Amino acid sequence: MVMVCVALVVPARAQGPDVNKVLADIRAKDQGQLAISEEDGRFLRLMIASGQRKRVLEIGGASGYSAIWMAQALRATGGRMTTIEYEPARAKELADNIRKAGFSDIVQVVAGDAFAEIPKLQGTFDFVFLDAWKRDYKKFLDLVFPRLEKGGLFTAHNVVNKKGEMEDFLDAIQRNPALWTTIVSPAGEGISLSYKK
């Protein structure tokens, strides 16, 4: 009788970037309070994953905290994101944080004025996250809405705690017959969700 022993060798999984550490480092350095809350980040990740979103636009990337939350979901959906940041130094920090978190292959960082950069982008979007100058929210909606796919979500941050700075935007998303809109507030700042019918 011959006995054959077969050993299955499973290679050790390569350790990737510690995304939680990158997120914690960004929060620790966020002196200007520009980053969204962790609760809002988890909410955005869930919205992208559950909706199987694949083409995401972020307007106002800051240091990359929200982009990293969304990129986690995009890794699962096979999607990609473009994030735009106006301040050059902050855009560099954003790109560095995206690289440290291991998402450079799916997140494109654009430094510049979003009003000038968005028209240069190709294609449409199925998810938009807006967290830029509050007084410009309505202008961004007008610029991006034609490129939001049917069934897409247009989301905006700070719609509760800074609603006085964006009344025209809030009125527009509530009255537009092509949108179903609601507002949620996981951490008190508020996120509007507008679904394009």
Where are these regions (language model features)?
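Bacterial N-terminal signal peptides
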Residues: 1-9
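A short alpha-helical cap/connector motif
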Residues: 10-129, 134-197
